[in-house]
């Protein structure tokens, strides 16, 4: 039986989450269902490099990219198209079946990575979490104990950072918000979901999964 291979990716963008104007960091981990890693890449996209220091969200990590670029820990490419081609070529070389991200409605819709679909199938890890981990009473308890609350205040937080804090039992965990680092934790979240052996959806973004048949759970804050 052929082994299923996955590509978990993450993007960091300038211009905000609603209408990003460019991707400056693209990272991915290619792996199997057990977390055995076949390849990784972290790409700094130079056409948007100068924009990092002027973006309210991105600039806090500008020093990280400067240091990693100087040390060779991150690879510089000229354009988004160059970065996309590297990711796509890796997926083709390793026979990837599913590309994945935590909220594919952003990474596979609003960035250059949208061009990976429909060539590859996809899994929205965020939707997967809502169909699995978020149904656990222990998750809601953990969120309440550590004040992990959604922006509306009506439900427990369901970000990748909070979910990873839960599965690692580390309430102090903070995402680095660099693409490869975030892709690693999203892969770990995916593997934890798989181990639950629960039904989950494929080839649909969380925001498009409407109706009771998708069995999404946003744990209520109030007990």
What positions do the PLM features span?
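Conserved beta-strand -> loop -> alpha-helix junction used to position metal-binding or nucleic-acid-contacting
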Residues: 118-134
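Active-site catalytic microenvironments for nucleophilic, acid-base chemistry
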Residues: 114, 166-170, 189-196
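Conserved non-catalytic scaffold segment of RNase H-like nuclease domains
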Residues: 2-110, 114, 161
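Active-site-proximal helix-loop-helix substrate-binding element of RNase H-like nuclease domains
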Residues: 47-67, 131-183
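Acidic two-metal-ion nuclease catalytic site recognized across multiple nuclease folds
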Residues: 148, 180-223
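Short, polar/flexible loop-turn hinges at active-site or ligand-entry regions and domain interfaces
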Residues: 69-74, 116-118, 170-175
């Amino acid at each position: 039986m052929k082994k299923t291979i996955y590509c978990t990716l993450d993007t960091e963008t300038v211009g905000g989450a609603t209408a990003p104007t460019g991707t400056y960091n693209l990272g991915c981990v290619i792996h199997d269902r057990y977390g055995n890693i076949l390849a990784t890449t972290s790409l700094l996209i130079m056409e948007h490099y100068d924009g990092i220091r002027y973006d309210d969200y991105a600039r806090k990590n500008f020093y990280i990219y400067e240091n990693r670029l100087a040390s060779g820990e991150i690879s510089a490419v000229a354009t988004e198209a160059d970065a996309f081609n590297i990711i796509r070529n890796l997926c083709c070389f390793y026979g990837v079946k599913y590309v994945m991200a935590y909220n594919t409605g952003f990474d596979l819709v609003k960035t250059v990575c949208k061009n990976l679909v429909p060539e590859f199938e996809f899994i929205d890890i965020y939707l997967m979490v809502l169909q699995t981990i978020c149904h656990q009473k222990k998750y809601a308890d953990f969120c309440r104990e550590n004040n992990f609350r959604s922006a509306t205040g009506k439900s427990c937080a369901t970000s990748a950072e909070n979910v990873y804090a839960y599965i690692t039992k580390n309430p102090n965990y903070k995402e680095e918000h660099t693409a490869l680092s975030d892709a690693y934790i999203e892969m770990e979240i995916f593997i934890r979901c798989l181990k639950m052996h629960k039904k989950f959806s494929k080839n649909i973004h969380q925001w498009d999964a409407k109706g009771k048949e998708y069995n999404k759970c946003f744990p209520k804050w109030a007990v």
